[in-house]
A protein has these predicted regions:
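C-terminal capping/gating helix-and-loop segments adjacent to ligand/active sites or protein-protein/ligand interfaces
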Residues: 378-430
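Extracytoplasmic/periplasmic substrate-recognition and gating elements
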Residues: 67, 174, 245, 252-256, ...
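Helix-loop-helix "hinge/cap" segment bordering the ligand-binding cleft or interdomain interface
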Residues: 71, 75, 146-212, 226-261, ...
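Hinge/lid segment of periplasmic solute-binding proteins
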Residues: 109-161, 217-218, 301
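Short, solvent-exposed loop/beta-turn-alpha elements that line the ligand-binding surface or hinge
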Residues: 125-138, 181-183, 198, 203-205, ...
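Extracytoplasmic "Venus flytrap"/periplasmic binding protein-like
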Residues: 68-137, 173-175, 180, 270, ...
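Short, well-ordered beta-strand elements
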Residues: 41-56, 76-81, 103-104, 153, ...
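Short, low-complexity disordered leader/linker segments with a strong preference
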Residues: 1-48, 71, 425, 435-444
Length: 444
């Protein structure tokens, strides 16, 4: 039910919003500061390709993709560099300041925003007018930038959808039908209350984890996170207050592990030990449970994510950006398209729990196969793929909801859930603090 975590190899890209804001001050102020490269019609020259923490697990795969590209385009050479997750955005900032960005660079959501907002990335939509139809619409749209029209500033790479994972044995013990999982936030809470009432304190329903639940739960409830101009937070509503009050009530009734209000890093252990009903909403988690807790895996069931009033999930894609002033634009663009092509993304998905952003790749029979319907990992792969076909950006965390904003909101929610302040005060204070942070970010 909580937002899907990025694959482990990408987790290191997520750094504090404050760090991004501060570091970005040293970058060029706009696209006019960087000269736009032009295509020559010849795929040639040496380009640099930077990935994030793919060695050594995926060395053979990536090198194979590079070798095949160089065989097709013998005048082009790809210099591959793989860097650790720690300090990834700081390195991007330093390279941008020094004019040393790679020609093709792996970007997460925040690092894309960091470089894109400052005009450091090429508009890939103008490089090939046919590119848009090659990718899942939700993924392609994700890499547009506010105020820049139909420009798209990175090729979508791999994605990870949100699903619902639960222990069907504990589900049934609580008097719930495993074939009827919750579809709305309100229903999810109703189920959690029943689980708490029937468990006798032997297991919990879900992790409190307000950092992971917000703003997703509110979006699914139809709560407006921002105003129409996208410059003010507007979540201070009766619905948000009701969410806090329900969380407080469920917390008091034992629907969540007490320690999960402050941390959620032990969920694998709790779920694997049969101590919690709902696991993380990630296909990768299902694979981990299969490997590490086979007895619980046998009782694991998966379903479509709780989507509430939205009716669809969001989409979070890794991407490949192209340096705006690359000296070899043809080679860089062709290589980025090569890496993100259907066949190459499908092959990658066989080695990691990821999904193609490429429409052809997502249409591969592998992603429709549910087997006999008994293996949770196989079913999870099919459900995730099906949901990606209708994924849309209005279910994504807004870029304005930085880590700083999230932390500020969560602090107030934690106080209210523990009973240290009332729900209405918590939501009001959270919105006020969030708007202060947003205003300060705009000034910078």
């Amino acid at each position: 039910m909580t937002r899907t975590n990025l694959p482990r190899m990408a987790v290191g890209t997520l750094v504090a919003g404050a760090l991004l804001s501060t570091a970005a001050c040293g970058l060029s102020g706009g696209s006019g500061d960087v000269k736009e490269a032009e295509k020559t019609g010849r795929v040639a020259g040496e380009i640099t390709f930077r990935t994030l923490q793919l060695k050594p697990a995926f060395t053979a795969y990536v090198q194979g993709v590079i070798d095949a590209f160089e065989k097709k385009y013998p005048d082009a050479k790809v210099k591959w560099e793989d860097v650790p997750g720690d300090g990834y955005n700081e390195k991007l900032v330093a390279d941008a300041q020094a004019g040393a960005l790679p020609d093709v660079v792996n970007l997460s959501t925040d690092s894309f925003q960091l470089l894109g907002d400052r005009g450091m990335l090429a508009d890939v939509a103008t490089l090939d007018g046919e590119s848009a139809k090659e990718y899942v619409p939700g993924a392609w749209e994700q890499f547009k930038l506010p105020g820049k029209g139909d420009g798209v500033y990175a090729y979508p790479w791999y994605v990870t959808p949100e699903i619902l994972t639960y222990n069907k044995e504990l589900f049934a013990k609580a008097g719930l039908d495993p074939a009827k999982p919750p579809t709305s936030v309100e229903q999810f809470f109703d189920y959690a209350e029943q689980i708490a009432a029937r468990s006798g304190g032997q297991y919990s329903a879900f992790m409190a984890d307000p950092k992971g639940r917000l703003p997703g739960d509110w979006q699914k409830m139809g709560i407006p996170i921002l105003n129409e101009k996208q410059d003010r937070f507007t979540f201070d509503t009766d619905q948000a207050v009701a969410w806090v009050e329900r969380m407080k009530d469920l917390y008091a009734k034992g629907a969540m592990p007490k320690e999960s209000l402050l941390k959620s890093d032990d969920i694998n252990q709790l779920y694997g030990g049969g101590k919690i009903v709902f696991g993380p909403g990630s296909p990768g988690f299902v694979k981990d449970i299969k490997q590490n807790a086979p007895q619980v895996y046998a009782n694991t069931q998966v379903a479509g994510a709780v989507t509430g009033k939205l009716g669809h999930i969001g989409i979070y894609a890794q991407s490949l950006g192209i340096k705006k002033d690359t000296k070899h634009l043809d080679a860089a663009a062709e290589f980025a398209k090569w890496v993100t092509s259907g066949p190459n993304q499908v092959e990658f998905s066989k080695k990691a729990t990821i999904y193609p952003s490429n429409a052809q790749g997502l249409a591969d029979p592998r992603f429709a196969d549910r087997g006999d319907g008994r293996d949770a990992e196989t079913v999870a792969r099919a459900i995730g793929a099906e949901q990606l076909k209708t994924a849309a950006l209005d279910a994504n965390t807004p870029v304005q909801w930085t880590n700083q904003v999230g932390d500020a909101v969560v602090r107030e929610m934690q106080k209210a859930i523990k009973g240290e302040q009332d729900a209405r005060t918590a939501v009001k204070k959270a919105q006020e603090e969030a708007n202060k942070l947003l205003a300060n970010a705009v000034k910078k």
